[in-house]
């Protein structure tokens, strides 16, 4: 049985890690974990602990700090290494948060450091084709070293379910959930709720984050807008099922156009129509199709969002049909089986290059 070592100070409960670790196991791999006390000295700790040599090292999402030490140990033991960054530190600091100006000394230094870092991996995983293009264009990763594996959703938790019963006393519900960051554009949701003109509707924003206070201030005086605190991950599927329409992301930042957030995968798998910004991150075939359970609106356009939600809320039959289409889209493009095929392809690529001999 081949073994993969999940290397880094990662969160085992994060959905990307949970899903991929399960897919490795389903493919017949033994999955082990090594979480060093200090990321930069991980190779020293691994040597002192005499870690058994795995067939593959996987440095998971957000663990840029672990990559260098992991690569040193991997090269010493002749083990291939896959890096699954999910984000770019340069992208986050410059394009997303605007903390560093493009072309500034600090930005250029960060870019050079990250470009050098990515070269230590035998393969780099991207969660969308748009992110793969970014890694090639900006970070200088060789196209042949990149594979795309969508995040998907855990099917044991997120399953299609019927819409809530329609009653005159209880309005339909549109649900946004997330971490209230600029990429998600929660303020666009609040503004859309303020502009909304349509059948009675309850707008719910669930979660915590830097923009929540601002959103609460914008929502003052509007009784149809409410906020809920974050809830345990295991209770999220049931919360989704209580809503009729799910909202994705609406930020106008460059990064917002390169991602498919967890909640879009989870909402589609739950059989709910998702209204979200148009982005190049989705499969081309899906973008070209109709009736896929995704309703596109321009980034940052609150009025377009309000109008699209009003159209959906006015047609219960169409709402149900779109929910069924959403579940079908999840099965076709983002199911665990689809993710597993993408992972298998990435591992086969390593074997083709002679880096491993077990795929």
Predicted regions and their residues:
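Conserved donor-binding/catalytic core segment of Leloir-type glycosyltransferases
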Residues: 5, 166-194, 204
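Membrane-proximal helix-turn-helix segments that form the acceptor-binding/catalytic region
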Residues: 46-48, 76, 104-124
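Active-site proximal beta-strand in glycosyltransferases
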Residues: 74-93
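Nucleotide-sugar-dependent
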Residues: 91, 184, 232-239, 246-268, ...
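Carbohydrate-associated surface elements
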Residues: 130, 152
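Nucleotide-activated donor-binding/catalytic signature segment of Leloir-type glycosyltransferases, i.e.
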Residues: 171, 213-239, 296
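Conserved acidic donor-binding segment of nucleotide-sugar-dependent glycosyltransferases
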Residues: 288-303, 311-316
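A short, well-ordered alpha-helix in the C-terminal region of glycosyltransferases
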Residues: 311, 318-332
């Amino acid at each position: 049985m081949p073994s993969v070592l999940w290397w880094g100070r990662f969160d085992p409960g994060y959905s990307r890690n949970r899903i991929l670790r399960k897919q490795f196991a389903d493919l017949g791999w033994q999955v082990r974990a090594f979480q060093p006390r200090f990321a930069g000295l991980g190779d020293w700790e691994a040597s002192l602990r005499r870690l058994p040599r795995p067939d593959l090292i996987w440095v998971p999402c957000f663990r840029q700090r672990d990559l260098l030490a992991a690569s040193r140990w991997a090269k010493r033991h002749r083990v291939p290494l896959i890096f699954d960054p999910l984000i770019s530190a340069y992208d986050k600091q410059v394009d997303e948060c605007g903390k560093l100006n493009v072309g500034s000394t600090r930005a250029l230094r960060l870019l050079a450091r990250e470009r050098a870092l990515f070269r230590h991996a035998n393969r780099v995983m991207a969660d969308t084709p748009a992110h793969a293009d970014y890694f090639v264009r900006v970070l200088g990763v060789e196209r042949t070293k990149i594979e795309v594996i969508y995040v998907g959703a855990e099917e044991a938790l997120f399953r299609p379910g019927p819409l809530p019963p329609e009653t005159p006393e209880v309005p339909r519900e549109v649900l946004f959930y997330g971490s209230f960051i600029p990429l998600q554009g929660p303020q666009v949701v609040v503004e859309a709720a303020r502009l909304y003109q349509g059948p009675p509707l309850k707008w719910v924003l669930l979660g915590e984050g830097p923009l929540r206070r601002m959103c609460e201030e914008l929502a003052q005086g509007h009784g149809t807008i409410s906020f809920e605190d974050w809830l345990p991950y295991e209770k999220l599927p049931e919360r989704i099922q209580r809503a009729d329409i799910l909202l994705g992301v609406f930020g106008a930042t460059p990064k917002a156009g390169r991602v498919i957030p967890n909640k879009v995968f989870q909402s589609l798998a739950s059989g709910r129509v998702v209204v979200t910004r148009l982005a190049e991150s989705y499969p081309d075939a899906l973008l070209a199709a109709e009736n896929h359970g995704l309703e596109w609106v321009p980034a940052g356009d609150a009025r377009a969002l309000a109008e699209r939600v009003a159209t959906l809320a006015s047609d219960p039959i169409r709402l149900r049909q779109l929910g069924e289409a959403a579940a079908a889209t999840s099965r076709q493009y983002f199911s665990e089986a689809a993710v597993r095929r993408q992972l298998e392809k990435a591992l086969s690529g390593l074997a083709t290059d002679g880096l491993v001999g077990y795929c």
